[in-house]
Amino acid sequence: MRYLHTMVRVGDLEQALDFYCRKLGLIEQRRFDSEPGRFTLVYLAAPGDVDAPTADAPQLELTWNWDPEHYSGGRNFGHVAFAVADIYALCQKLLDQGVTINRPPRDGRMAFVRSPDGISIELLQDGAALEPREPWLSMPNTGSW
């Protein structure tokens, strides 16, 4: 058995791609449109997984159903997690692009944000935690994460 991907349904594909690719930095690997099924699948990978030694690197599958649907309960899914090279730099980049940092990286190790569809995204500092510092140290939580 091997892990393949995590699928999340999105309400607006372009908005989701803006968040996951432009803001978070994931890279689109492949896309599949199904006319009969009326859906689009987009597979994304973290930059560190793009050149993985096998084609079995984990991916995030975005599923967009062409006919409008309302999805609720993003919180009951749990979260998707990514290891990041510099949690402070990424959180600042996200903040500068209008993304709410729901759980700031006060400890230099962990932060949470949400996708446009309400999916909780955990960001973990790769390796040892960074030294706690401002503005993150005194930044309060916003909403749920």
Sequence positions of predicted segments:
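Eukaryotic phosphotyrosine signaling hubs
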Residues: Y3-H5, R75-V80
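Core segments of cupin and vicinal oxygen chelate
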Residues: M7-A57
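Vicinal oxygen chelate
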Residues: R31, F82, Y88-W145
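Short glycine/serine/proline-enriched coil/turn segments at secondary-structure junctions
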Residues: E35-P36, H70-S72
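Short, charged/polar surface micro-motifs in flexible loops or helix N-caps
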Residues: P47-D51, D67-E69, I87
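Short, low-complexity disordered segments enriched in Ser/Pro/Gly and basic
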Residues: A55, Y71-R75
